[in-house]
Amino acid sequence: MNKNEKMVRSLMGTVVSNKMNDTVVVRVERRVKHPKYGKFIKRSTKIHAHDKGNEGQIGDIVTIRECRPISKTKSWTLVKINERAEKVE
């Protein structure tokens, strides 16, 4: 890695909304251990990500990475679509 490059955080999640122009809402799940009982619990976060070509559809599994702030709520951008959602007709 060059000294000019820096590590960029990337996450994987599911698209839950694509109603905005150039934006998708991605739900990222993580597993957290309960402090007292030790059971693993699913916790999720909804992140607004920039989707330049409006390619993300609801149900797609996508990879997003952190970037400069694009708007008040968007600091992530869509990198690639790992798995497309099944079409329901």
Swiss-Prot record:
MF terms per GO, please? rRNA binding; structural constituent of ribosome
| Keyword Ribonucleoprotein included in the entry's annotation | yes
- Listed Gene3D superfamilies: Nucleic acid-binding proteins
Database matches in Pfam families:
Ribosomal_S17
Q: Does the keyword Nucleotide-binding apply?
A: no
Source taxon at top rank: Bacteria
Q: Return the GO cellular component terms, semicolon-separated.
A: cytosolic small ribosomal subunit
Signal peptide span: none
Concerning InterPro entries, the annotation shows: NA-bd_OB-fold (IPR012340), Ribosomal_uS17 (IPR000266), Ribosomal_uS17_bact/chlr (IPR019984), Ribosomal_uS17_CS (IPR019979)
UniProt keyword list: Ribonucleoprotein, Ribosomal protein, RNA-binding, rRNA-binding
GO biological process terms held by the UniProt record: translation
User: What is annotated about its quaternary structure and interactions?
Assistant: Part of the 30S ribosomal subunit.
Spell out the family assignment given in the record's similarity comment. Belongs to the universal ribosomal protein uS17 family.
Q: What does this protein do?
A: One of the primary rRNA binding proteins, it binds specifically to the 5'-end of 16S ribosomal RNA.
NCBIfam families membership: PRK05610.1, uS17_bact
Stated name of the protein? Small ribosomal subunit protein uS17
State the organism named in the record. Coxiella burnetii (strain RSA 493 / Nine Mile phase I)
Give the organism's phylogenetic lineage. Bacteria, Pseudomonadati, Pseudomonadota, Gammaproteobacteria, Legionellales
- What would be the name of the gene that encodes this protein? rpsQ
